[in-house]
UniProtKB/Swiss-Prot annotation:
Pfam families according to UniProt: SurE (PF01975)
Reactions the enzyme catalyzes: a ribonucleoside 5'-phosphate + H2O = a ribonucleoside + phosphate
Listed InterPro entries: SurE (IPR030048), SurE-like_Pase/nucleotidase (IPR002828), SurE-like_sf (IPR036523)
Protein name: 5'-nucleotidase SurE
Length: 255
């Protein structure tokens, strides 16, 4: 099995190194193609108005001066074009990708790009909690559960255009309750904040910052189950159609 690994935290990030170690337990044919620096929050963006640079670190490690989706495209269309990957793994993200996080996430969108190409694809994230080990991000649950989850999803009979969003809970490994397949949850709007300051030349600057929002998650959604110390797996698809609204909207526009 040929595995392509990417992320949105950059090729030097701890999470992608851990994911590579996990991948090598599954296959000895692993190639890493990741952004040359952190590209968090890039969603499914592509670099179309500028050239991209490809940096070869060795035969198995490459970095791209672009987005996570750029990296997947570069891996499939250039680096592995003669032997395309059978599996795309994206992560392990430094922090959760739960609920509406998936719409901003470069990690999840890189997995989406793989799915669009018809390749089995999985995005993986380690949930971060400020209360966990004095704010330190531990990948212990990802290390312990990652291989098992990936192997099970590889064997999935769902179409390859279905991809998976996996989140490992922020708890001690012994406290993980198991794996749950869940729907995408919901966060109340307000997690994004705008920080304002003044630069040395007296001009205003603005910085978007992620905070915590009080959330009334749907029961048994990914937020809810992650908070309960489950490894959550959510099947996603590139098709964003709100199927339940098709007929009501048809009725409205037919008037």
């Amino acid at each position: 099995m040929r595995i392509l690994i990417t992320n949105d935290d950059g090729i030097a990030a701890q999470g992608i190194k851990i994911l590579e170690e996990i991948a090598h337990k599954i296959s000895d044919d692993v190639t890493v193609v990741a952004p040359d620096k952190e590209r968090s929050g890039m969603a499914h963006s592509l670099t179309l108005s500028l050239p991209s640079r490809l940096y070869k670190h060795d035969d198995r490690h490459y970095s791209v001066s672009g987005t996570p989706s750029d990296s997947v495209v570069m891996g499939i269309k250039e680096i592995m074009k003669d032997n395309p990957p059978d599996l795309v793994l994206s992560g392990i993200n430094h922090g959760a990708n739960l609920a509406e996080d998936v719409t901003y996430s470069g990690t999840v969108s890189a997995a989406m790009e793989g799915a669009i190409a018809g390749i089995r694809s999985i995005g993986l994230s380690q949930v971060y909690s400020p209360d966990f080990k004095n704010g330190a991000l531990s990948f212990d649950t990802a290390v312990s559960w990652g291989e098992k989850v990936i192997r099970q999803l590889i064997d999935s009979t769902l179409p390859n255009r279905t991809f998976y969003n996996v989140n490992f809970p922020a708890c001690e490994n012994d406290d993980v309750k198991g794996i749950r397949v869940v729907a995408q949850g919901h966060r109340d709007y307000g997690r994004l904040n705008v920080e304002k300051g003044v630069d040395p030349r007296g001009k205003d600057w603005y910085w978007l910052a992620l905070g915590e929002a009080i959330s009334k998650d749907n029961l048994n959604g990914d937020l809810d189950l992650s908070y309960q110390n489950y490894v959550t797996v959510t099947p996603l698809a590139p098709n964003l159609t709100d199927v339940a609204s098709l007929q009501p909207l048809t009725d409205i526009l037919a008037k």
